[in-house]
Amino acid sequence: MNTNQSKFPLLAVGLSLSLWAACSTNHEHGAGVSAENGQGAYATGHYRNLFVEAGHPPQEVQARVEACFNQLFHGNPTNQAVYYEAGSNSNGPLAYITDIKHHDVRTEGLSYGMIIAAEMNKKAEFDALWNWSNTYLYHAATNDPGYGFFAWQARTNGARMSQSIAPDGEQYYVMALYFAAGRWGNGQGLYNYKAQADELLHRMIHRGLITGAGGRGGSQTWGPLFDVTNKMALFTPAIDRNPLFTDPSYHLPAFYELWSRWGPAEDHDYWAAAAQASRDLFAKVVSPVTGLNPYLANFDGSPYRGRGGTNFSYDAFRTAGNWSVDWSWWGKDVRERAMSDHLQAFFESKGMTNYGDQYTLDGRQLEGRHAQGLVAVNAETSLAATDPGRSKEFVEALWDTPVPDGLERYYEGLLYLMGLLHCSGEFRIWAPH
């Protein structure tokens, strides 16, 4: 969960080549094109490298990704890094990723950092982030309304700022853990990655209602992270919030397809249906003219009229990356191609180097900041878009954008690094052992 409100990513080229060679040989190979498997990377084993397609040498692309990781994870702590080591405990080293601007730690950033680490074969960083998450954020008490999930926000010393849950974090934790099991195998306890993923995934849809002290005080009742009937991620699992609603950027059909194969067997059909429900929601919430989607939505696809939810703002620009990666991995829903085309046409019309990052759905600009994270996500839409010339413009815009630093480097930087991984074909599927 990210908002600008109170509640609200360079080693020697030789080493980089070794890493990327491993990436090209150890991910899950193509399962074969079929109606069930789709026609994307899961079926074919082929991940497009949009930078190479645009004419950049593979070695330069590889070096760029590694340099970005090094800056954000191990750069100058004053104005470059978002990853910070934090001692150790009985489970090993601890580390967190912090939102520099808001002086806090969020499950969003921790889970993003873990999936980046899994993709880039950085086991030490992965384990340290997972250890910190469990040490400080995990709701362990069985009478806690948040039991089995993670408090979404804390200070850098681990003191919780909120007990509430933001389901985007749990979803990325699960996917990162499955990929870790595929890359490195499973260890013991906290580092039995697949067992941890299975348990959390099961709770996301099956955990019962628990009433107790939670959130901002008082007695609250929280349940599972998904609306089980609509098969959609909730903005928050507090069931006494009426009506319940969703955040389109929490919808990750590319992940749900994998969970329908790798997760607990009794839930395979559920996750397959959830993938389709998310694709259908995208088609409802996205403007057919601008390609923009609201920050928050009701389950029927209408914008949620609260918390600024009717506008393209805050979390909203992550959504296009979700549907574009879904097309890249699965290739099941051609509507995603049209949505990417509409979005690219809109932002191109606003000027490739100066479009803003907040709009009404009909295209009136609300905020003029040219966000580096949005540049990255818009480049990802080239994975699904159909106009080669225009798609290349968006890829080149990301290539020409420097690694975020300074005050905004948390959200912009993590989205930027994930954008580099997606556009270089190195954000891949790693089947768990």
Give the ranges of each region predicted by the language model.
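Bacterial N-terminal signal peptides that target proteins for export
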Residues: N2-L11
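Aromatic-rich carbohydrate-recognition surfaces in CAZymes
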Residues: H103-L110, G158-G185
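Bacterial N-terminal signal peptides
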Residues: A12-W20
